[in-house]
């Protein structure tokens, strides 16, 4: 996600608990995509939260709450995107888990109430997202209790080639959006493909 946003002109801070780990990630992305002017900077998590006007928490779902709390002092009034899916591998299938608040995104909003949390980017196929030479070709369902957050996330989503942002209502809908990821993963396994979400019948013109 960091490389995708940098590729369309955003200056992106990549955060990690260790700045040196973030430097390894940034250096790796720049080496992989030398033909792109990727404006990436390596930071520890706190410095990344201070730098960013919009924050994307891209940790595994069971680390999302800890991450949000660790930088909570720097998230007030900022748009915070939760893209985690609470899933468990059971046999050959992934099954959705429902956190106490109903979704990972709602849990983040409860922990950092002064932030404007949005749920987004749950269904983007990772390989396509990471291939900067090709469009992603996916709809992005965005939900939030803050209209300004939905608008901000929609604006950056629309700049990613192939992505179409869709306002999917309040944060209560994050429960279903996160859980549906398990269905897509099962389809990928069953049909040996990499599926993405594309809805018909919606005209944004």
What name fits each language-model region?
Residues 80-102, 119:
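Conserved Rossmann-fold NAD(P)-dependent oxidoreductase catalytic core, especially the SDR/UDP-sugar
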Residues 99-123, 130-131, 152:
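Short, glycine-/small-residue-rich phosphate/pyrophosphate-handling segment
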Residues 138-205:
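Active-site-lining helix/loop region of Rossmann-like oxidoreductase modules
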Residues 93-101, 131-148:
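Short beta-strand and adjoining strand-loop segment in the mid-core
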Residues 1-30, 159:
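NAD(P)+-binding Rossmann beta1-loop-alpha1 motif at the extreme N-terminus of oxidoreductases
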Residues 33-79, 86-92:
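Rossmann-like NAD(P)-binding element
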Residues 32-41, 113-116, 163:
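A short helix-to-beta-strand connector/capping loop
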């Amino acid at each position: 996600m960091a490389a995708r946003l940098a590729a369309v002109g955003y200056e992106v801070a990549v955060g990690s608990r260790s700045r040196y780990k973030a430097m390894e990630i940034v250096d790796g992305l720049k080496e992989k995509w030398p033909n792109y002017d990727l404006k990436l900077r390596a930071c520890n998590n706190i410095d990344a939260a201070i730098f960013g006007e919009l924050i994307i928490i891209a940790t595994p779902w069971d680390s999302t709450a800890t991450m949000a709390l660790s930088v909570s002092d720097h998230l007030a009034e900022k748009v915070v995107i939760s893209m985690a899916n609470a899933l468990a591998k059971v046999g050959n299938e992934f099954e959705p888990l429902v956190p106490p608040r109903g979704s990972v995104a709602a849990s983040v909003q409860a922990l950092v109430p002064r932030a404007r949390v949005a749920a987004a980017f749950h269904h983007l196929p990772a390989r396509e997202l990471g291939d900067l030479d090709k469009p992603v070709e996916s709809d992005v369902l965005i939900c939030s209790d803050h209209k300004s957050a939905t608008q901000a996330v929609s604006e950056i989503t629309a700049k990613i080639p192939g992505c179409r942002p869709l306002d999917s209502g309040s944060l209560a809908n994050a429960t279903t959006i996160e859980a549906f990821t398990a269905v897509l993963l099962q389809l990928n396994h069953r049909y040996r493909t990499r599926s993405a979400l594309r809805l018909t019948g919606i005209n944004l013109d």
